[in-house]
UniProtKB/Swiss-Prot annotation:
Organism: Shigella sonnei (strain Ss046)
Family: Belongs to the bacterial ring-hydroxylating dioxygenase beta subunit family.
Keyword DNA damage belongs to the record: no
InterPro entries: 3PPDioc_HcaF (IPR054881), HcaF (IPR023712), NTF2-like_dom_sf (IPR032710), Rng_hydr_dOase-bsu (IPR000391)
Record field: catalytic activity: 3-phenylpropanoate + NADH + O2 + H(+) = 3-(cis-5,6-dihydroxycyclohexa-1,3-dien-1-yl)propanoate + NAD(+); (E)-cinnamate + NADH + O2 + H(+) = (2E)-3-(cis-5,6-dihydroxycyclohexa-1,3-dien-1-yl)prop-2-enoate + NAD(+)
A Pfam family it matches: Ring_hydroxyl_B
Record text on subunit structure and interactions: This dioxygenase system consists of four proteins: the two subunits of the hydroxylase component (HcaE and HcaF), a ferredoxin (HcaC) and a ferredoxin reductase (HcaD).
Annotated protein name in UniProt: 3-phenylpropionate/cinnamic acid dioxygenase subunit beta
Length: 172
C-alpha cells in the first residue's frame, strides 16, 4: 500500500470531494464539469456475483461497462440534461451524495492521489420513486499548481448486482 497522506492533505482532498458532491446534488453540472480533469476516465462496470471457489482461484466473471466516459461524453450527457428533453429526468431527480470511510494515499505520479470512499447515493423522483445506490468509489485526484484540485479518474463499484431503478441518469 502506498504512503498515506498528512491530516491536512486528507482534509483538503476530502473537502474537494464534499464540494463536488454538493455540486451534483444542487444540479450545478457545469460547475461540476470544471472540477474534472480534461483526461478524466469515469467508469462503472456491472457487478457479478462470483462463487467462493472461483474467487479463491482468482477467476473473475466477465463484466460489461455501464459507464466508460471521457470528459467529452460527460459534457454531452449534461448538455442533454439541460435541454429538458431527457425524459428520464422529468421531473428532475433529487439526489443526496453521501461519502464516508475516505482513504487517501500517494501514487507514483507527483501531485496525483488515490482515494477510496464508500458512498450512498439517494435518488428521489416524482412522488414515490426512490432508489439507493451503495458501493465504493476509486478516485484519483490531481493537485494543480494553484492548489486547486481536479478529478482525474472515477471508478464506481456498485454493491448491487441488479439495478432496480428505471434508469441510471444520475452522476456518481
Amino acid at each position: 500500500m502506498s504512503a498515506q497522506v498528512s491530516l491536512e492533505l486528507h482534509h483538503r482532498i476530502s473537502q474537494f470531494l464534499f464540494h463536488e458532491a454538493s455540486l451534483l446534488d444542487d444540479w450545478k453540472f457545469r460547475d461540476w464539469l470544471e472540477q474534472l480533469d480534461k483526461e478524466i476516465r469515469y467508469t462503472m462496470r456491472t457487478t457479478v456475483n462470483a462463487q467462493t471457489r472461483d474467487r479463491r482461484k482468482g477467476v473473475q466473471p466477465p463484466t460489461t461497462w455501464i459507464f466508460n466516459d471521457t470528459k467529452d461524453q460527460l459534457e454531452r450527457r449534461i448538455a442533454r440534461l439541460e435541454t429538458g428533453m431527457a425524459w428520464a429526468e422529468e421531473p428532475p431527480s433529487r439526489t443526496r451524495h453521501l461519502i464516508s470511510n475516505c482513504q487517501i494515499s500517494e501514487t507514483d505520479i507527483p501531485n496525483v492521489f488515490a482515494v477510496r470512499v464508500n458512498y450512498l447515493l439517494y435518488r428521489a423522483q416524482k412522488e414515490r420513486d426512490e432508489t439507493f445506490y451503495v458501493g465504493t468509489r476509486f478516485d484519483k485526484v490531481r493537485r494543480l499548481e494553484d492548489d486547486n484540485w481536479r478529478l482525474l479518474e472515477r471508478d464506481i463499484v456498485l454493491d448491487q448486482a441488479v439495478i432496480t431503478s428505471h434508469n441510471l441518469s444520475v452522476l456518481f
